[in-house]
Design a protein with these regions (language model features):
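Helix-to-loop junction immediately C-terminal to a conserved catalytic motif
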Residues: 48
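ABC ATPase "signature
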Residues: 217-218, 226, 298
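ABC ATPase NBD coupling module
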Residues: 64-78, 102, 108, 226-227
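Conserved catalytic motifs of ABC-family nucleotide-binding domains
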Residues: 153
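Conserved ABC ATPase "signature" region
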Residues: 108-127, 180
Length: 311
């Protein structure tokens, strides 16, 4: 659990973050979203004390972050930034090994961790360990950057616009990979972005910031259906609210029991994708299949459309 309590940062007479208080559940992904200058990156950096707060405090698992030296705190909190931030003169393996070496891990443990992480990120250790950052694609660089942030097995991972420099296809894959890895390790992730679609795609909860304040901290569906401020309505958009809402639910979660004669859709597909399939095929319902090919249930067009409306 991360408790952010009345956290404030001022530079002279300018207040960048203004008495922010939020609680972040262990093992969840929280996304902080806002426009440029809203204070979101400053808030993130106060969690690991890259920026020292003017007032307020951060408590991680019951311990105030000021109770230990800042450099020791940062060694147990993963940190990934836009553009990967890899050391250009170090190999992939050396980059990933950075924090474990600072923590005094033995060579065998470090080597095993490097190999495990590269395999998890679908990078062959034999092929990629000795490569340097300039020899990697943008997507590969970003994966190595996240692998480095996870190398010392942190319970908390901070990410500042980690996918902002990637093209849309690679970015979507990187987002899916992050979700899969978070489920695997149970890491508590706090991620900053200016992209509301990315926030909804990744976040269990989303904090919307403007002028240094958190206007609303809630589940994505609540931000769409019950925005607490006109700024949130503008940020989330009104023209495609139904599509965004459908993107938040999977076919497996919405399926009902009963046979269906329509096109097959994966249980992991979003209702937005199911709607597209039904409109394209002209079918009134779809058959929902589990990953192993067994039938999960069915989804009618009416049931899908109902999920695109507020309660």
């Amino acid at each position: 659990m991360i408790e952010i309590e009345a956290l404030t940062k001022r530079y002279g007479s300018i207040t960048v973050v203004d008495r922010v208080s939020i609680s972040i559940a262990t093992g969840s992904i929280t996304v902080i979203v806002g426009t440029s200058g809203s204070g979101k990156s400053t808030l993130l950096r106060m969690i690991n004390r890259l920026v020292e707060p003017t007032s307020g405090r951060v408590v991680i698992d019951g311990s105030d972050t000021t109770s230990e030296p800042a450099h020791l705190l940062r060694r147990r909190i993963g940190y990934a930034i836009q553009g990967h931030g890899l050391f250009p003169h170090r190999s992939v393996a050396e980059n990933i090994a950075t924090v474990p070496r600072l923590l005094g891990w033995d060579a065998a443990r470090i080597r095993a961790r490097i190999d495990d992480l590269l395999k998890i990120f679908q990078l062959d250790p034999g092929e990629f360990s000795a490569k340097f950052p300039h020899q990697l694609s943008g997507g590969q660089q970003q994966r190595v950057g996240v692998a480095r942030a996870l190398a010392a097995e942190p319970t908390v991972l901070l990410m500042d616009e980690p996918f902002g420099a990637l093209d849309p296809i690679i970015r979507a894959k990187a987002q899916d990979d992050l979700r899969d890895i978070q489920r695997r390790f149970g890491t508590t992730i706090v991620l900053v972005t200016h992209d509301i679609d990315e926030a909804f795609r990744l976040g269990d909860r989303v904090a919307v910031m403007s002028n240094g304040q958190v206007l609303q901290y809630d589940r994505p569906a609540e931000l769409l259906t019950h925005p607490a401020d006109p700024f949130i309505s503008r940020l989330t958009g009104t023209g495609d609210r139904a599509m965004k809402l459908l993107s938040l639910t999977t076919a497996g979660d919405a399926a009902e029991q009963g046979p269906a004669a329509g096109p097959a859709v994966a249980a992991s597909a979003t209702l937005r994708e199911v709607l597209s399939d039904l409109v394209w095929s002209g079918a009134p319902e779809a058959t929902v299949l589990n990953a192993d090919g067994t039938e999960r249930g069915r989804l009618t067009l009416d049931r899908v459309l109902a999920r695109g409306r507020p309660d």
